[in-house]
Amino acid sequence: MNMAKDIKFSADARAAMVRGVDMLADTVKVTLGPKGRNVVLEKAFGSPLITNDGVTIAKEIELEDHFENMGAKLVSEVASKTNDIAGDGTTTATVLTQAIVHEGLKNVTAGANPIGIRRGIETATATAVEALKAIAQPVSGKEAIAQVAAVSSRSEKVGEYISEAMERVGNDGVITIEESRGMETELEVVEGMQFDRGYLSQYMVTDNEKMVADLENPFILITDKKVSNIQDILPLLEEVLKTNRPLLIIADDVDGEALPTLVLNKIRGTFNVVAVKAPGFGDRRKAMLEDIAILTGGAVITEDLGLELKDATMTALGQAAKITVDKDSTVIVEGSGSSEAIANRIALIKSQLETTTSDFDREKLQERLAKLAGGVAVIKVGAPTETALKEMKLRIEDALNATRAAVEEGIVAGGGTALITVIEKVAALELEGDDATGRNIVLRALEEPVRQIALNAGYEGSVVIDKLKNSPAGTGFNAATGEWVDMIKTGIIDPVKVTRSALQNAASVASLILTTEAVVANKPEPAAPAPAMPAGMDPGMMGGF
């Protein structure tokens, strides 16, 4: 049965959504900058989480009013998308969204055409992004990488760990962040590999908040066959069940009745199982499965060797210390394969590299070599309390993402300074009518991050912006000390990818809100009446329990 709906139109619809935008943005923006404050989040279980991570806060906010909640959810989407693309900049994106929505709403309410405004916003945003790319400086070398990581995590020590990890496993190498048993944070490089295949069903996750499946000390079934009939793997499942250890299935596919059966057993808690598709295609898939088997000390169950799934025994299963699976990738840490077998496999790939004449094959062989020989860097986070540990872990995850983004697209002056620098280019756009209004909205929004950073540090935003506009290029306001400095030399930097993604996502969602003419929400259902008391029962009797 369909629920009854509440519908609001034009100004009413937009006003309700903007109330939601404001509630979320006002909560998140207090965390912006070096003097940003913390937000305390109540948790259903355990102690509250204290954080200044924008996306973590945004995901927690759920409003009672359906219309307001839709506005809040749209801004939360901006934060999440920016986090997915660049790994940081979620608070900046939230502040920019709120600024564009507010400025835009004033003009729409005054009678401007929302479609014209949207066009102007899109043109101005594209110009600002190009201008950001033009002033970007490349990041290379261990020291520069450490500096970027230290700024994002607010800790020089963390900066050193991240640059060290990236040096040892490569910029695209696998770096995982785990909780340490001690008080100290430390870096360790272990044998491991990552491939680009995620879980086949989201019901297989073990951490619903992060939507990942963590398998400790698992067995690994590796096959190039399709698993459609659960009977084929039932004998193996029963053997694994006796050990009380989790299982990862890497197969050509898991479908038919096999997938729902596995999911059902996972949900019931019978056993912990995750299924993923095998990586690669054709002959390369066979080679990659063989790599995984050698790394984990297992065997590939394949028709090429005349092996059948139903005849497989526990000896064919690989093992590892830990496996993490998210929606897009699988990371195997410390496989149980023998060092000698792994070394032989690496030597084989190297000899193939020397003899191949195809550039494509060479690239794929190098990829396999990096996966086998590169290992996985593990940053083990230590802290005195569980609350501090969670906060530190979030900070390091942000820093790692920001550092990768910096290496990819370069850096610009931080603290919102780069957004002020590109104002000149955006202002030079020759637009007319509502398009020009859209451009002016973006011009005003570009000032907002600096204004908020100054405000959080106890300074007057307008004064700081005014002085910044009249300062030499590259000079900015260090909110931590209250001084005017050369931002990049001082190490106050932002990855271009972070700043660019924040602006693009904010402009996109804010434009959608401004062009909204109707909002449809579910009507809250009336509370069910309390069941009637059986006849002859004295209400006073209830007090005895």
Swiss-Prot record:
ATP binds at T31, L32, G33, P34, D88, G89, T90, T91, T92, G415, N478, A479, A480, D494. GO terms for molecular function: ATP binding; ATP-dependent protein folding chaperone; isomerase activity; unfolded protein binding. CDD domains: GroEL. It is an enzyme of class 5 (isomerase). Its EC number is 5.6.1.7. Together with its co-chaperonin GroES, plays an essential role in assisting protein folding. The GroEL-GroES system forms a nano-cage that allows encapsulation of the non-native substrate proteins and provides a physical environment optimized to promote and accelerate protein folding. Forms a cylinder of 14 subunits composed of two heptameric rings stacked back-to-back. Interacts with the co-chaperonin GroES. This is Chaperonin GroEL. The gene is groEL.
